[in-house]
Amino acid sequence: ARQLDAVTGDRAVILVSADLHSSWCNTAAMRKLGIEGDGFLREQTSFDVQTQLSQVNPHVLDGWVGSCSTAAARLGITGIRDMEFSTDVETWLQREADGRCPLRVEVSVYPERLDEAIAQGLATGQAPVTDKPGPSRVAMGPLKVIVDGSMSTRTAWCMDSYPAGAGPDGAGIDSVTPEDLVDLINRAKTGNLQCAAHAIGDRAAKEVLNAFEVTGISGSIEHAQVLTDADVRRFAALGVRASVQPLHLVDDRDATDVMWSDRADRCFRFADMVRAGTELALGSDAPVSPVDPWGAIRVAVERTGDRRPSWHPEQALTLSQAITASTRHVTQVVTGGPGDVIAVAHNPFDLSGDALAGLTSDLTVVGGEVTAAAL
């Protein structure tokens, strides 16, 4: 804190890491927030501070969400999974009633509100019954559990230590114990809720896969940034989806070569997972990375987002694989299907590089209703 004080003086300042897993506070900010320590906050303590900073008038927030949702529809996005700490199904139903929900939304729940979510009686993917004509676009999501931290904050829980890694052995930390994780998933199971587990390090991923195996329910691992060979093969066998964010590769490739140089060839193993039969889902993890579906597809295919050479090109997806992983593995429009369609002006199979990344939607349709049109 004192180092930041020298630059900021008595004005309260909090610098939040791009990965959101750490924050740096000066003394004035610590005093204002009522926290103690050296000013460097990691994981839950940092999340708690960010939650305090994010407090805003609900009507203002709903307006922002509506604007962002409309912008997402223009990019060709038809659905999102909301993993904010403080959101809920009722909030999104009200936004839908107010005309601020042009997307399908699955609303995740954190352990602190798990019992409340179970009491609602909605399974993951199930929409509540409303007075609105037709089915709601809002549905219950999974239980979200943060199992470890991030590479940049040096809290990702790994098999092996890394430079300045957190934890007693320098290999990162577990945000929830394996025993507690199994307990949480079993509780979610009673309410027919799946689990989406944040796991960046290979030790975290292994423990999550172990928990899925013990409990016998399906779900996803969010990020799966570094994996052992053995665990790559376990995803398909257990029916676990790998929810990955290609744009993190652009953000993390340089840091990976420094901090995880001994395991860089085991990071962002998109091709290996597909070859092993894993269901891959491409996403953004916004606001950590931009909401940029075609940019993510470009990186998944080319393993670079700029003019630098491909980073570990052996893990590149084909364009067909990347598009499939971006559309919930729906590859064709069929009678009785959900009616979610986008139209683009150029054939993506004729494009590469910035041209592919720059694609936007000329027409976005959700459930048969036009949600964005540039035609």
Residue ranges, per PLM feature:
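Catalytic pocket of metal/acid-base enzymes, prominently hydrolases
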Residues: 1-107, 134-189, 364
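A cross-family glycoside hydrolase active-site/sugar-binding cleft signature
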Residues: 16, 82-83, 104-110, 141-146, ...
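Flexible loop/turn segments at secondary-structure boundaries
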Residues: 21-23, 79-81, 87-91, 113-117, ...
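Short amphipathic alpha-helices and their capping/turn segments at secondary-structure boundaries
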Residues: 28-37, 116-142, 227-241
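His/Asp/Glu-enriched, well-ordered alpha-helical/loop segment
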Residues: 63, 185-196, 200-219, 223-224, ...
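A structural motif
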Residues: 77-78, 192-193, 240
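Distinct, well-ordered alpha-helical segments
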Residues: 90-95, 117-125, 205-215, 234
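P-loop/Walker A phosphate-binding loop and immediately adjacent motor/lid segment at beta-alpha junctions
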Residues: 353-375
